[in-house]
Regions:
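Structured mid-to-C-terminal alpha-helical surface segments
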Residues: 1-27, 38-41, 53-225
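Glycine-rich beta-strand-to-loop/alpha-helix junction loops that act as flexible
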Residues: 29-33
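Short cationic amphipathic helices and targeting signals
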Residues: 49-51
Length: 225
């Protein structure tokens, strides 16, 4: 856990660096790391994912992002791709790298809000604009269906426990349940077990995503009646 705690401190330091350079105002923070830092998601996440808050010159922003990052960290990779801006950095040689992805897409109006990013492993809080939990649920449904990562299923169950309404189509519900049934013992023991907090590991080994599956299938049945 010490390695993950140190990496989380790195993530917070990077957000603080962005805020000090007035770059956070152009971005909407999303993904698992946002849920961890802004909503206390009980798992660690290694990357930072952003969308644009408003129309922006992508090339100009990428230049400012690289400049701000290089002042504090060693940049190990930087690419402007067709759909996103990618940046990878580390604090020192031999330390874990932090990957940043900024999608070349403006977040839909009304899907974001301001929140405080916080970690017990970093001394400063950072004000950021993030996706609403309702929008994060939609994003995570799409992610789980597309890539089938167990962390996305964990995040969906977390969002349901936070009271988010599972507004899915029948096709989406079927696709999500199919993904849930496809996870193996190793997925829970290794993939999920390595990133969630220790006191939750045994629960998910035994119960898996029973709560998530029952909630989705109940909503599906209820919508038919």
């Amino acid at each position: 856990m010490k390695r993950l705690e140190d990496h989380e401190s790195f993530e917070m330091a990077f957000l603080n660096q962005l805020a000090s350079r007035r770059l956070t105002g152009s971005l909407v923070f999303g993904g698992g790391t946002m849920l961890r830092l802004c909503h206390e998601l009980p798992r660690y996440s290694l990357d930072l994912d952003f969308w644009f808050y408003n129309e922006t010159d992508f090339g100009d922003f990428f230049g400012r992002l690289r400049e701000a990052s290089s002042q504090a960290y060693e940049i190990t990779d930087a690419q402007e791709k067709f759909h996103s801006l990618l940046l990878e950095m580390r604090r020192a040689r031999g330390t874990t790298k932090l990957k940043i992805e900024v999608r070349k897409k403006v977040a839909t109006a009304g899907t974001s809000e301001q929140k405080i990013a916080y970690s017990p492993h970093f001394p400063t809080q950072v004000l950021v604009r993030v996706f609403t939990l309702k929008q994060m649920f939609k994003n995570k449904v799409s992610a789980l269906i597309e890539r089938g990562e167990i962390r996305d299923a964990f995040d969906l169950e977390f969002l349901l426990r936070k009271g988010v309404d599972p507004d899915l189509s029948h096709e989406e519900t079927n696709a999500v349940v199919k993904r849930l049934k496809g996870f193996k013992k190793r997925d829970f023991d290794v993939k999920l077990g390595s990133i969630i907090l220790p006191d939750l590991r045994e629960y998910y080994r035994v119960n898996r995503f029973t709560f998530l599956e029952e909630k989705l299938t109940f909503e599906k049945w209820q919508s038919k009646s």
